[in-house]
Amino acid sequence: MMTTHKQVNIYTDGSCLGNPGPGGYGIVMQYKQHSKEIADGFALTTNNRMELLAPIIALEALMEPCIVTLTSDSQYMRQGITQWIHGWKKKGWMTSNKQAVKNVDLWKRLDSVSQRHNIDWRWVKGHTGHKQNERCDKLARDAAEAKPKQIDTGYQESL
């Protein structure tokens, strides 16, 4: 008997007040009629780190391999995971101009957690009224504005 994987829709966004500064991420996950929201904040981080951490946390929350449609307004995250990452891995996590890949800790985590799922990475233009993207944006901003105390150790170690 063939098992069918669950189809899950995930929407993510990251926010940073100042860049670097306090930051947060927002996630909306939908499966059939169920919906779950996740958000968290960090005392000092960057917008790109929050844009990467959101899909990591969302995918890590899935208890089994799923068919995922993941929608984000971050071209950086989407292009990184669908295009740039292949070259980075071949070059030992270096860019084409021999620089260390920024946020490599998160890129490695995203690469790893992506392997167990079948993911359609989609991009949506931010701040254009896309319901779930707007909700993620609010969750992320609220988390960043809540004076978060949590330390983004990956960011601190890169300084």
From Swiss-Prot:
SUPFAM superfamilies: Ribonuclease H-like. One of its GO terms (molecular function) is RNA-DNA hybrid ribonuclease activity. It is found in: Cytoplasm. Its EC number is 3.1.26.4. One of its GO terms (biological process) is DNA replication, removal of RNA primer. It holds the Pfam family RNase_H. It catalyses: Endonucleolytic cleavage to 5'-phosphomonoester. Binds 1 Mg(2+) ion per subunit. May bind a second metal ion at a regulatory site, or after substrate binding. InterPro entries: RNase_H, RNaseH-like_sf, RNaseH_domain, RNaseH_sf, RNaseHI. Mg(2+) 2 binds at residues 13, 137. The keyword RNA-binding does not apply. It is an enzyme of class 3 (hydrolase). It comes from the Bacteria. Residues 4-145 form the RNase H type-1 domain. Keywords: Cytoplasm, Endonuclease, Hydrolase, Magnesium, Metal-binding, Nuclease. PROSITE patterns: RNASE_H_1. Mg(2+) 1 binds at residues 13, 51, 73. Gene3D superfamilies: Ribonuclease H-like superfamily/Ribonuclease H (3.30.420.10). Its cofactor is Mg(2+). Belongs to the RNase H family. Endonuclease that specifically degrades the RNA of RNA-DNA hybrids. NCBIfam families: PRK00203.1. PANTHER family: RIBONUCLEASE H1 (PTHR10642:SF26). Monomer. This is Ribonuclease H. The lineage of its organism: Bacteria, Pseudomonadati, Pseudomonadota, Gammaproteobacteria, Alteromonadales. The gene is rnhA.
